[in-house]
Structures are given as structure tokens and as C-alpha cells.
Amino acid sequence: MFSTSAKIVKPNGEKPDEFESGISQALLELEMNSDLKAQLRELHITAAKEIEVGGSRKAIIIFVPVPQLKSFQKIQVRLVRELEKKFSGKHVVFIAQRRILPKPTRKSRTKNKQKRPRSRTLTNVHDAILEDLVFPSEIVGKRIRVKLDSSRLIKVHLDKAQQNNVEHKVETFAGVYKKLTGKDVIFEFPEFQL
């Protein structure tokens, strides 16, 4: 039998904690006895977190390497269904593990000779997290409402076609996004108008 850490590869060779080992074990079991075996064999995760969203509900965030995100998304709907069964109805979301590089200032410019790629900027990473979060639904529009006290509220418009699949998870998405980025977000399913 494989070890529980077979499905989790932490950066810098850190040891996975108990919760991450549990997730890893669940993925291993799915790989052993489900028809996802071929797709899951090549894939691994980098971290997992459990957070509280909206009062008493808990959500599980699973971080995956960016190059493997596409492969995970091919089987994500079934994988999430199986994992939610295993973890008694906790919502499961998959997000790519992205890195944000600090903005180059006058003082720090000498250290990194290379220009910071767009994909490592805070704005881009936060947008990408939002897209990973709502998968398999798609973001069709976005409105940022700045209130008088200069706090921001992001209204995200999701694809009406996917409303039945993701509507019950909208609160979880908002909670997870707030936890990861500190930004408030509301999800809506607007009627499409030209």
C-alpha cells in the first residue's frame, strides 16, 4: 500500500500535517477503487486547508500545482462529488497554488533583475483564484462597487446556465475568497440582456 503522503508534494520538502494527509489518503483511495484511476495517477496536490464559512459550515480548499490545474479541472466535477461524500457534505474547492511577487520599489529593484511577470501580480492572482473557485461555472461579468467609506464590494456575474450546479455553493465561494484575499465578493446570476 502507498504511504498517505504519496498524493501530496509540499514545497521546500515540508511535511504534510494531519488534515493534508487525510485529504491525500482520500485521493489515494479514489485512485485505487474508482474509474478516475488513469487521470488521478499523474496528479498531486501541494496543500489543503479547512476553513469556516458562513457560521457553522466548513469548506475544504485543496491547492494544486498550476501546470496540473487543467488536468484536475477535467475530472473536477466527479472528484468534488466523491470528496464531498467522503467528508460528509463539506464543500470542496480546487485552487491553483500561485505566487505573488512583491511590487518592485526603488529600494528593491536591484535584487530581482527580471521584470515581474503579469501572472505574478496581486491583481492577476486574485482574479485567477476567483476563476478557479467558481469552476465549472464561468465569470461573465464583474462590477466593483466602491462605497462612501471607500470599502469595495466585488459583484461577480456567473453564467446563468450553471446556476443549478453552483448556486448552493455561492456562500462558500464568497467565504473562501474573503479568507484567501481579504476581499468581499457577491455572486449573481443576471439575466443576459443586450
UniProtKB/Swiss-Prot annotation:
Cross-referenced InterPro entries: Ribosomal_eS7 (IPR000554), Ribosomal_eS7_CS (IPR047861)
Localization terms from the record: Cytoplasm, Cytoskeleton, Microtubule organizing center, Centrosome; Cytoplasm; Nucleus
Alphabetized UniProt keyword annotations: Cytoplasm, Cytoskeleton, Nucleus, Ribonucleoprotein, Ribosomal protein
Signal peptide: none
Main location: cytoplasm
Keyword Membrane: no
Gene Ontology terms for molecular function: structural constituent of ribosome
Highest taxon listed in the record's lineage: Eukaryota
Biological process annotations from GO: chordate embryonic development; hemopoiesis; regulation of cell cycle; ribosomal small subunit biogenesis; rRNA processing; translation
CC annotations in GO: centrosome; cytosolic small ribosomal subunit; nucleus; small-subunit processome
Function: Component of the small ribosomal subunit. The ribosome is a large ribonucleoprotein complex responsible for the synthesis of proteins in the cell. Required for rRNA maturation.
Assembly and interaction partners: Component of the small ribosomal subunit.
Annotated family: Belongs to the eukaryotic ribosomal protein eS7 family.
Protein name: Small ribosomal subunit protein eS7
Organism: Danio rerio (Zebrafish)
